[in-house]
């Protein structure tokens, strides 16, 4: 198991990528939106490099990527809940052909659950399910990798359980 923690696209976006990775705008010039886009592009580049390295050198079987929260580059983040854009996170799962052969039920469950609602509070159970992590805290009903995943839009909450996902219009 390899775990990478990326600082990703947190503010100050201009400091989240090397200047030679500037695609939009001019290197070193503050512009929240363009700097945010460049930070996202850089994160994608780092993920691509990690994926290629692990696939060619480490016999990569499965990979999970997710962000801790979404962001709106047009305003500063506050501790108060502002809007649902912060709840929308990028996430992907890669599985090798060998992994799919050996764990077909998990693959099929992820496919059938791909349009279901999910919050990053459930990442622990998803990781346990995908990576065979044994724990007495693991609940397969809370893992997208199992066919008995139980949550719907109406069930889930965010912001320490105070905001219902179903309130997102």
Question: Model regions: which residues?
Answer:
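Catalytic domains that recognize anionic headgroups
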Residues: 1-169
């Amino acid at each position: 198991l390899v775990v990478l923690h990326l600082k990703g696209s947190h503010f100050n976006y201009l400091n989240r990528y090397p200047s030679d990775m500037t695609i939009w705008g001019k290197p070193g010039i503050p512009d929240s939106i363009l700097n945010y886009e460049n930070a996202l592009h850089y994160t994608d580049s780092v993920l691509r490099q990690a994926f290629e390295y692990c696939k060619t050198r480490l016999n990569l079987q499965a990979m999970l990527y997710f962000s801790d929260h979404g962001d709106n580059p047009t305003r500063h983040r506050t501790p108060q809940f502002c809007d649902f854009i912060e709840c929308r996170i990028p996430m992907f799962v890669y599985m090798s052909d060998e992994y799919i052969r050996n764990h077909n039920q998990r693959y099929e469950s992820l496919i059938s659950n791909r349009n279901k609602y999910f919050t990053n509070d459930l990442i622990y159970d998803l990781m346990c399910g995908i990576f065979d992590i044994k724990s007495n805290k693991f609940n397969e009903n809370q893992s997208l990798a199992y066919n008995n995943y139980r949550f719907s839009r109406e069930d889930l909450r965010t912001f320490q359980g105070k905001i219902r996902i179903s309130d997102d219009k």
